[in-house]
Amino acid sequence: MKVAEQSALLVQYARFSYTHSMSNYKFFDHTADIGVEVYGRTRKELFMNTAGALFDVMIEHKAGRATAKRQKKITVEGTDVADLLINFLRELLHLFNGEHFITGSCEIIEFSNKKLQARLTGESFNNKKHSIKTEIKAVTYSGATVKRVESGWKARIIFDV
């Protein structure tokens, strides 16, 4: 199989996990909050990498990787791609804050500029297995961008802490 074909398969089946590579995102300075710049070869990969960054910032696993015990299907809408990304991340944060659901993997099964549907696999927060690294209060619109770049796509997001 050629490298391009392997890459296409990886993107098609891409999921994020808590061993998510920090090479897909980096932090930028922002007063009193956390700024994250995230990259993806496709918009779908960008969204999954951004979700991975959210949970990498929030959760520390004391006992290894997340064990997939629960599944959820979510549908999110937005007025444009940036709004869709913010709403997607807000839904993940809502599931964590409201149901203590830690998303361990994410498969985006439907995606357009204004709507996405994703299948989430994860587990409930457990003090014996997890700790909170950083409490994120909200995903903000302040400075949020999603744009095409030479290597694919880039987003800048600010997490209110």
Task: Describe each PLM feature range.
Residues 2-11:
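Extreme N-terminal basic, low-complexity initiation segments
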Residues 23-40, 44, 49-161:
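N-terminal intrinsically disordered, cationic/polar leader segments
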